[in-house]
């Protein structure tokens, strides 16, 4: 949905069924689906909700991992957490919910493709989590998150060691050097930044990673290099 109208009663009921929550304040659901490019009478969009939803998701996923992987150390838990709150995972949840049918955007956003459109879908999922939290409380938000993330948490390739640690040990053994990470670009608003990080190991081609934190972007870059060099098996798309 690209026009700035509210959801139809039928669409709202269908989406609420997928979410598992009937909104007491229907406007919250509408706002969670409204991109800043959409012109609405009340001028509301999902940016503030996205800020809150990111924190609610992080808390619930951290608790899920803490309870599920009782022997995992901080490093492994961090790797799993970064995977599960990444833009890729959030966008996959958006696709599972068919949110692209309901997102309200302006004409310019309709032209977006690839990673930029993936980020929009990911942002909407975080906004939706915030709307659920504000409307129903933390337990309702947690129930939604568990519904769509618990299976992913079990499947997540977090059994791998920390990518930066693995890359450092490999580069020391093979080349006698330490990987070098640099931030090439920081973009996006303060509440939702994107970091582009490049990792370099002397003698081989560098790799880049883009994520919502510097640490997560470093992990992405390190993972890509490990997979490219055949140290790690490449993860299937969507996992």
Curated annotation (Swiss-Prot):
Cleaved signal peptide residues: none
Active-site residue numbers: 54, 126
Biological function: Digests double-stranded RNA. Involved in the processing of primary rRNA transcript to yield the immediate precursors to the large and small rRNAs (23S and 16S). Processes some mRNAs, and tRNAs when they are encoded in the rRNA operon. Processes pre-crRNA and tracrRNA of type II CRISPR loci if present in the organism.
PROSITE patterns linked to this entry: DS_RBD, RNASE_3_1, RNASE_3_2
Organism from which the protein derives: Rhizobium leguminosarum bv. trifolii (strain WSM2304)
Gene transcribed to yield this protein: rnc
Xref: InterPro entries: dsRBD_dom (IPR014720), RNase_III (IPR011907), RNase_III_dom (IPR000999), RNase_III_sf (IPR036389)
Residues annotated to bind Mg(2+): 50, 123, 126
Protein name: Ribonuclease 3
SUPFAM superfamilies: dsRNA-binding domain-like, RNase III domain-like
């Amino acid at each position: 949905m690209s026009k700035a109208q509210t959801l139809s009663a039928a669409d709202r009921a269908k989406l609420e069924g997928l979410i598992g929550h009937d909104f007491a304040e229907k406007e919250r659901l509408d706002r969670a689906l409204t991109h800043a490019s959409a012109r609405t009478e009340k001028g509301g969009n999902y940016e503030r909700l996205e800020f809150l939803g990111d924190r609610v998701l992080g808390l619930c996923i951290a608790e899920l991992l803490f309870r599920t992987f009782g022997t995992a150390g901080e490093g492994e838990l961090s790797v799993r957490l970064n995977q599960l709150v990444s833009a890729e995972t959030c966008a996959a949840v958006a696709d599972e919910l068919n949110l692209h049918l309901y997102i309200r955007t302006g004409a310019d956003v309709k032209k977006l493709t690839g990673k930029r459109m993936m980020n929009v879908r990911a942002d909407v999922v975080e906004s939706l989590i915030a709307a659920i939290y504000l409307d129903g409380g933390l337990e309702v938000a947690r129930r939604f998150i568990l519904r769509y993330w618990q299976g992913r948490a079990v499947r997540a390739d977090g059994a791998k060691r920390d990518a930066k640690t693995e890359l450092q040990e490999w580069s020391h053994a093979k080349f006698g050097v330490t990987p070098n990470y640099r931030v090439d670009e920081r973009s996006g608003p303060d509440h939702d930044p994107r970091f582009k990080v490049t990792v370099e190991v002397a003698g081989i081609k560098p790799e880049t990673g883009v994520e919502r934190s510097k640490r997560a972007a470093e992990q992405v870059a390190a993972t890509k290099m490990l997979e490219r060099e055949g140290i790690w098996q490449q993860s299937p798309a969507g996992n």
